[in-house]
Amino acid sequence: GEEDPSALETWNSVTERFGGPFGCRYEPSPMSWLRRESKSGQTTIVHLTMYGEPWREAIPRIPMDKPAIVVVGGTKVPAETYHISDFNVSVGNQPHSEVAALAVFLDAWVGSMDEPSRFSGGQIEVVPSPRGKVVITHEEE
């Protein structure tokens, strides 16, 4: 896609404020990068697509002991993506939101994201509350 510095700035800002191990960057040639990663064998490539195998069947086989690249499919995903991916996984076989597919996949693969320890190091901490907003601001040291 096209480079959008504002998207990267937003994601990096959210990570800085709320914590957690998240990184992002613009890749000018994503298919070349995916090919290199596929050939290296050092990462697992997971392609989320409505044409893949059911997520409940695929997830137990996806290794957790090496980095993963999750490609969220859409109408413009090159056909080659299906061939270089280690797993083509569907969250449903009907059109659906790519963000929803990613959320379902990540929750099932890495587990619940609502544990406070998953997002340490942030300036802001949201405390679960049945009513209203409870936020703790951590002062920088």
How should each PLM-predicted stretch be described?
Residues 1-3:
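Short internal beta-strands
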Residues 8-77:
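S-adenosyl-L-methionine/SAH cofactor-binding core of RNA-modifying enzymes
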Residues 54, 123-124, 134:
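Compositionally biased, intrinsically disordered low-complexity regions
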Residues 62-64, 88, 106-107, 141:
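General N-terminal targeting signals
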Residues 78-79, 137:
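Basic, gly/Ser/Thr/Pro-rich low-complexity segments located predominantly at protein N termini
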Residues 81-120, 124-130:
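Structured adenosyl-cofactor binding patch, chiefly the S-adenosyl-L-methionine
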Residues 130-141:
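Long, charged alpha-helical interface segments
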